[in-house]
Amino acid sequence: MEHGRDEYERVIDLWVRSERDRRALKRKYLDGVCYERIAEELGISPRTVQNIVNRWRGTVERHL
């Protein structure tokens, strides 16, 4: 099932408390930005971005 941008944004805003995590997830899911670029923007490592996305992936997908 295909989910739209608005649905992803709604779920992320509703379930993800951390501003940093919300920003990382939106850049990845909504904008398709690579881990390295997100890491540069947020001042964290690409591995941390990957961990954020992996940590929240199940929650986001369950609530779509």
Residue ranges: model-predicted function:
Residues 57-64:
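Short, Lys/Arg-enriched C-terminal cap helix and immediately downstream tail that follows
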